[in-house]
Amino acid sequence: MIMDFVSFFEPASLLYAAMVFLSRVVDVSFGTLRTISIVHGRTTMAFWLGFFEAAIWLVVVSTIVQTVTEQPLLVIVYALGFATGNIVGIKFERMIALGHLVLRVISRHNSNEIAYEIREQGYAVTAFKGEGRSGIVTELYIVCRRRDMKRILKKVMALDPKAFYVSERAGEVSNVYRPIMQPMTGWRRVLKKKYHSPSSALQGFSGEGSSPSSLSQLGRAERHFPGTVLRCRPYVPFLVISFASEMRPPDTARAFSFGQRCGLARLTPPCISQRALHGTSLSGEALVSG
C-alpha cells in the first residue's frame, strides 16, 4: 500500500492522473450542458454534446478499470474530476446564458421612468397596476434574453434601489425585443471606429466624391435629427448617412417617414416600424443617391 502511494507521485503517474481529472471535468461539463440544452429544446447542441460526452466517458472508464487496482488513488482523482465538472458546467452555462427569461419588476416609485428607460434600450415592457401592503404598486413584465438581465436590472436599481424583482425561465417565446445598441467590450472596443460629428464630416468634404444634392440631403438629415447624425461617408455616386436617434413618439413616426424617403440601405433593428410604434431608439443608415 505504501509503495502504491509513493509510486502515485512519480511524474508519469501524476501526468496520467491529471489527464484522467481533466477528461472527467470535460466529460461532466458536457453532460451538464447537454441536460440544459435538452430542457431548452436545443436538439442539435444536445446531440453533439451527448456524442462527445459518451466518447470521453468510455475512454476514461476503460482506462481507469485497467489501472485502479495498481493505483487506488485514481478513484479520488476520478471523483474530484466528476465534482469539478459539475461546477465548471454550471459556470460555463451561466456565462453563455442560453435561452430567455421572464423578468417581473415591482416598484412603488419611478415605475414610469423605469419602463421608459427599459423601452429606450430596445426592450418591450408591459405594466400592470396592483396593490401591496403599503399601497399601489406597478409590476413591469419583461421578456428578455438571459444575458441581458443584468443590464436591465442595473438600470432598474439605479432608478429605484428598493424595487423587487423575480425572474423565471421562459419556454417558447414568439418574439423577443433585443437591445438596439449593444455596448462594445473586449476586442470589439479595440476595433471600434471613431465617429465624426456632422460639422466635422461636412468640413471633410471638398465636394469631390459627393454631389450638391447629396450634401443637401445631409442638411435635411441634420434638420430632421438635430445632433443625431453620427457620420457620413462618400461612396461615389452615393452618400451614406449614419444616424442614431433616441426620440419619443410621435418623433419616431417622423423619423421612419424620413428614412423611407431617403431609402434605407440597412436597418438596425430590422423591424423599424414596430420599434417606432413602441417609441424606442432608432438607428440605421440612409443611402442617398448623388
From Swiss-Prot:
GO cellular component: plasma membrane
Highest taxon of the lineage: Bacteria
Record keyword Zinc-finger present: no
Record membrane topology: Multi-pass membrane protein
Compartments reported by the entry: Cell membrane
CDD domains assigned: YitT_C_like_1
Transmembrane segments: 15-33, 45-65, 72-92
This protein's UniProt keywords: Cell membrane, Membrane, Transmembrane, Transmembrane helix
PANTHER family: UPF0316 PROTEIN YEBE
NCBIfam families: PRK04164.1-2
Family named by the database record: Belongs to the UPF0316 family.
UniProt-recorded name of the protein: UPF0316 protein DP2912
Species of origin: Desulfotalea psychrophila (strain LSv54 / DSM 12343)
